[in-house]
Regions:
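Generic detector of well-ordered alpha-helical segments enriched in charged/polar residues
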Residues: 29-33, 124, 169, 173
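Acidic-basic catalytic patches of nuclease active cores, encompassing PD-(D/E)XK
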Residues: 159-175
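Secondary-structure-rich domain cores
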Residues: 45-46, 67, 73, 175
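Contiguous surface segments at macromolecular interaction interfaces
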Residues: 61-66, 72-162
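An acidic- and aromatic-residue-enriched active-site/binding cleft used to recognize and process polar
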Residues: 52-54, 71-74
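A generic alpha-helix propensity feature with a strong bias for hydrophobic helices
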Residues: 16, 134, 166-168
């Protein structure tokens, strides 16, 4: 929420290269378009950012939509699997720049996504439905001030604010 997100590609441990995974290939293709000319950016796919969340004891199936992003970096890394054998494997990590949707009241017109899928709709017509930050990015090629930044309040519990028992600070509070 501070203007960037990271997405680890879809590679898994085994004998495949990081480039052999369909999701990684698609993200790399999108990255090339995102870093290309205005015409290529206009036709490039947006990255829709979702967060998986647990709900009512269920781990899968619930997501929160966080917005539309542009890929600003792709890096080949070595990743270690979670749990179990903890094997290492090559994968990509993609840096994403979520775009500001404040002009759209933090919502997305899904007609834009649907129009993108329709081959009979011209790219310029599709762009008319895009969020304003996406249009500006297509035009300029720079995400700079178009990044989404969410200001959050940090709420600290009372217990966390209290000094350790027996400390000088605790003695001051008792006086």
């Amino acid at each position: 929420d501070q203007g960037y997100s990271r997405y680890f590609g879809d590679a898994k441990p085994g004998n495949k290269s990081a480039n052999d995974w369909l999701g990684n290939r698609r993200m790399l293709e999108a990255f090339i378009q995102h870093e290309s000319t205005e015409a290529a950016r206009a036709d490039s796919p947006p990255v829709l950012v979702f967060e998986a969340v647990g709900e009512a004891g269920r781990i899968k199936g619930q997501v929160i939509f966080h917005g539309v992003a542009v890929i600003t970096r792709a890096e080949l890394i070595v990743q270690r699997e979670d749990g179990g054998r903890r094997r290492t494997f090559p994968n990509y990590v993609f840096e994403l720049a979520p775009l500001d949707l404040s002009h759209e009241n933090e919502s997305l017109d899904w007609n834009w996504i649907n129009a993108r899928r329709n081959p009979s709709v011209a790219i310029r017509e599709v762009l008319q439905l895009a969020p304003s930050a996406w249009k500006l990015w297509v035009e300029s090629g720079s995400v700079g001030s178009l990044r989404r930044n969410v200001v959050t309040r940090g709420v600290v519990t009372e217990a966390m604010q209290r000094p350790n028992p027996g400390s000088i600070e605790a003695a001051i509070l008792q006086d």
